[in-house]
Amino acid sequence: MGQKVHPYSLRIKINRDWKSKWYFDKKLYSEILHEDFLIRRETMKFFKGIRFDISDIEIIRNNLQRVTVVVSTPRPGSVIGVKGANLEKIGQLLTRKISKKINIKIKEIKKPEFDAQIVANGIAKQLENRASYRKLLKSSLLSSISKGVQGVKIKVSGRLGGAEIARSFEVKEGRVPLHTLRANIDYGFAEAQTTYGVIGVKVWLFKGEVLGKQTNSDAGQVINRKSSREKSEHFDRSRVDDRGRKVLNDDKFSKEKLELGSKSNNDFKKKNGSDV
């Protein structure tokens, strides 16, 4: 059976960026990676009451002793707390855990319907509150489509409606081209802790295709595309056919060049007195 690759890992450096931004010596890699896992785990544990309001946690390191943690949320007020109390507490907690200076920043999501993780979190939250999964998925799908998303796919898996056997249910609207690398696909996953067990929620949002200039990733340079008109009008002086006629790039001969080549060929025959 064909398996789905994560849309982010497939599009890294095409239209997606890393969620941990740092570069250190090979010997320190495992230690710093472990710290990143710890920071994300402790941050989500601290914000357990409002975990459905957090979309993403980005970690940036400029040096070994300073870490910047960027929390993306559509409700920054609930994350910051009264006079920044929550930020101060989580900062102190993480500093004790990894013995480094932590700087917490909040990034506001202005359009929650365009964020797949927030949509998945919202569905998981309502499933925990015993909402009907069929109505819930269809309403979430229509809400995102009405806001301008080009394609939506939502899938829930588990003991849906308290059924004895776990199964999956999926709804889809519009285009969701998972194999198109230039497609801007947003992906989110959440888990709903119900009385019957865990229900997994997956959301794919298609926001359009990333077009424009072609980028040469190897050289890190921008290649300017030539229009088709420029290509057809450009004359390649280095290409000459076996009769002395010059050839255009699109392999079409102009009338003027054909006559010129034919005349030069006849002159050559008369001069040498033999067929060529």
UniProtKB/Swiss-Prot annotation:
Gene Ontology cellular component? cytosolic small ribosomal subunit
The Gene Ontology biological process terms listed for this entry are: translation
Checking SMART domains in the record gives: KH
**SUPFAM superfamilies for this protein:** Prokaryotic type KH domain (KH-domain type II), Ribosomal protein S3 C-terminal domain
**Residue intervals of the KH type-2 domain:** 39-110
Region feature Disordered, mapped onto this chain: 218-243
- Keywords in alphabetical order: Ribonucleoprotein, Ribosomal protein, RNA-binding, rRNA-binding
Basic and acidic residues: compositionally biased ranges: 227-243
Under InterPro entries, the record lists: KH_dom (IPR004087), KH_dom-like_a/b (IPR015946), KH_dom_type_2 (IPR004044), KH_sf_prok-type (IPR009019), Ribosomal_S3_C_sf (IPR036419), Ribosomal_uS3_bac-typ (IPR005704), Ribosomal_uS3_C (IPR001351), Ribosomal_uS3_CS (IPR018280)
Q: State one molecular function term (GO).
A: structural constituent of ribosome
Q: Family membership, please give it.
A: Belongs to the universal ribosomal protein uS3 family.
On subunit structure and binding partners, the annotation says:
Part of the 30S ribosomal subunit. Forms a tight complex with proteins S10 and S14.
According to its UniProt entry, the function of this protein is described as: Binds the lower part of the 30S subunit head. Binds mRNA in the 70S ribosome, positioning it for translation.
The entry's protein name is: Small ribosomal subunit protein uS3
Organism expressing this protein natively: Borrelia hermsii (strain HS1 / DAH)
